Amino acid sequence: MQKIVVYVYIYLFVQISVDPVALDGSSQPTENTEKDGLCNACTWRQNTKSSRIEAIKIQILSKLRLEQAPNISRDVIKQLLPKAPPLQELIDQYDVQRDDSSDGSLEDDDYHATTETIITMPTESDFLVQMEGKPKCCFFKFSSKIQYNKVVKAQLWIYLRQVQKPTTVFVQILRLIKPMKDGTRYTGIRSLKLDMNPGNGIWQSIDVKTVLQNWLKQPESNLGIEIKAFDENGRDLAVTFPGPGEDGLNPFLEVRVTDTPKRSRRDFGLDCDEHSTESRCCRYPLTVDFEAFGWDWIIAPKRYKANYCSGECEFVFLQKYPHTHLVHQANPRGSAGPCCTPTKMSPINMLYFNGKEQIIYGKIPAMVVDRCGCS
């Protein structure tokens, strides 16, 4: 008896869907059916876009392992954001993330974001180290997730103030250590001699990969560093504690780590625009604007092309899933049976502040829809 009731219900459902009937029993007009169908498709696509944007916001926070968006104001960002060459290059390169699906077929294996570069700003030490009676720059904290054998490059960037005439500058980077019996409290990391010309100040990078790896292997040995950069007259040119007009000139560490393996995937699908009358499963353009979210903590890109899938899945599945096809004909927007979903996705590169006010450059997998299909 239950089976009969189910069959009757399905039959009525199909009949009503295929041949609509008005409440008074008369058949509804069919002359505007095609127009109504197009309007319904537009409404469906608009709903899909809205859902996709909300899903992207949730995915980004989840993949970055953030419980909520970092609360960092634009004024704080202006103070913290280094005006250094490597960072400016990243910002210029990824200001607007483009759709590269036409020439790329690589996809990350993992769900979570893959860190490629970390920009670490100096912070207060857990234990205050003093030399010559006053605190010295700088102390850097590192995430325990950074493995010493994954570090490819580690550069300390320092800003040297401008000079009024051609000058030779002597730069010393010292690593602070626990006081020894003879009173020694530091050991040398790097020393170099630079020739500076009059004009604007300059950024100088120093290789500190070996020191960083030692710190990662033995965190208790990380007591900080001291930066010295004296000209011929003994004037210290290094900006260690920025003064008025020196926002963004703090020393910082640029650390690059190895990326995860990638696999190659190829697929094919339809591409449509917002004015398309295509009813089949298709990829549509969608640009996500982070500034519209109020997400100032994302440095770059400010916008990126995410795309989304929309459309019907019908005849392709007729032979393999005949009953599913029937249900889709009756209710093409229903949840049963194959759906129009992404079949290939690619990552985006992102430069952002995390909750600890560190600048991270990483890759977030599966954020751009490259192809759509029925599955």
UniProtKB/Swiss-Prot annotation:
Matches recorded under Gene3D superfamilies: 2.60.120.970, Cystine-knot cytokines
Signal sequence, start to end: 1-23
One GO term (biological process): muscle cell proliferation
Propeptide, residue positions: 24-266
GO cellular-component term (any): extracellular space
Subcellular location, record wording: Secreted
Coiled-coil annotated spans: none
A GO term, aspect molecular function: cytokine activity
Glycosylation sites recorded in the entry for this protein: N71
Homology family: Belongs to the TGF-beta family.
Name used for this protein in its record: Growth/differentiation factor 8
